[in-house]
């Protein structure tokens, strides 16, 4: 509860996401996310839209490789009705075949949009290569050939098998009454018991992949094995990422962009999954500056491995990360997201104080040891999109 607000954020989090799909089911989890807005046994799609607008609410959803989330934000007075709409959508969808045909076309357009978004495509091709042979390699949206045979009956069967009580978290933050809590408990207890099928484990394998696209800039993602999302080292990883590529004072931004003008955009990030992860450095630049930029990135990493961070860098990264936590948890929406994601993935919710304390406890030695664990050049990978070189040429540029 947040006593100083008049709104509430509500989310239904379903574990699994696209990584629970078989190759033939690729895209089903995301297809279902779309279909749950298209009508229930009690409401048409227009009813859902009109009722949501009538209470001044916002409803949306997203699918990742690990989960699907349906969420809404409303004034506290309208929370009971929002709760009814959301549970009706998520658990009583009609999966009408006519709506399936229409929505398939929408998703195919969404796939085309991603094909035309080179930074997203670059990451997707990277994951497809380093996790080849596992569900983590497949795109969340699926492909035209996997979506084509999906019917309403197929999607409903997939939904019923995966949307189980033991696989679901309901998160509520903001201003709400005890009656609303009781309503959630009652609805949640009525959900079918059981868990969804366990996902197939994935493991990182180094890979180089080049995807030709007729665009002006080349988009590069350099990657190394990372951490799973529950790793106790994840706070050290955040500080490492902040120092290397987390902002305008970071080493990569300063040395690749500010000092040499080799790119416009460059940053680093960690992508964690249940049992594995990837640490990525992304940049967008002209083909003529690729070689120099990649050499600079390697030099920055090797210098960090040899000398570690300065005291000033470490404290700046710590304060930056702690500020992001505090500012990020001041809205009902972000706090709901933190609670739902944490409970679904780790079974516990760390308080803001616990998170800040975890950052305070990270030492310089922790960050240096983690960098030495991650930055093994023999396990480096790269995805390139644009006016690309060959994969072997990129291998030579990265590995020397």
Predicted feature residues:
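Short alpha-helix boundary/capping segments
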Residues: 20-27, 228-240, 244, 248, ...
């Amino acid at each position: 509860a947040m006593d100083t607000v008049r709104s509430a954020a509500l989310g239904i989090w379903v574990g699994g996401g696209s990584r629970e799909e078989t190759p033939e089911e690729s895209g089903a989890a995301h297809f279902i996310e779309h279909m749950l807005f298209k009508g229930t046994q009690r409401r048409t799609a227009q009813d859902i839209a009109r009722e949501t607008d009538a209470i001044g609410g916002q409803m949306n959803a997203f699918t990742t490789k690990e989960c699907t989330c349906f969420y809404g934000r409303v004034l506290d007075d309208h929370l009971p009705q929002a709760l009814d709409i959301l549970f009706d959508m998520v658990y009583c969808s009609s999966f009408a075949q006519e709506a399936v045909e229409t929505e398939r076309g929408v998703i195919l357009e969404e796939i085309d949009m991603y094909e035309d978004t080179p930074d997203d495509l670059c990451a997707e091709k990277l994951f497809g290569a380093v996790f080849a042979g596992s569900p983590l390699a497949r795109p969340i949206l699926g492909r035209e050939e996997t979506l084509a045979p999906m019917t309403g009956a197929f999607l409903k069967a997939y939904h019923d098998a995966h949307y189980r009580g033991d696989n679901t978290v309901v998160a509520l933050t903001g201003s709400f009454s005890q009656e609303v809590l009781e309503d959630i408990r009652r609805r949640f207890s009525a959900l079918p018991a059981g868990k969804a099928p366990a996902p197939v484990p994935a493991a990182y394998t180094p890979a180089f992949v080049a995807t030709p696209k007729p665009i002006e800039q080349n988009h590069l993602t350099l990657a190394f094995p990372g951490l799973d999302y529950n790793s106790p080292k994840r706070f050290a990883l955040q500080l490492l990422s902040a120092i290397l590529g987390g902002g305008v004072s970071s080493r990569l931004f300063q040395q690749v962009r500010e000092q040499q003008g080799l790119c416009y955009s460059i940053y680093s990030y960690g992508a964690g999954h249940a049992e594995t992860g990837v640490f990525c450095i992304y940049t967008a630049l002209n083909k003529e500056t690729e070689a120099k930029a990649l050499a600079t990135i390697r030099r920055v990493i090797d210098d960090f491995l040899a000398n570690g961070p300065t005291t000033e860098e470490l404290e700046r990264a710590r304060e930056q990360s702690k500020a992001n936590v505090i500012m990020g948890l001041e809205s009902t929406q972000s706090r709901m997201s933190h609670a739902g994601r944490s409970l679904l993935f780790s079974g516990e919710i760390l308080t803001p104080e616990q998170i800040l304390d975890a950052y305070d406890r990270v030492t310089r030695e922790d960050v240096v040891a983690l960098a030495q664990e991650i930055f093994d050049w023999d396990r480096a990978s790269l995805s390139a999109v644009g006016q690309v070189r060959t994969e072997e040429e990129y291998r030579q540029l990265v590995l020397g």
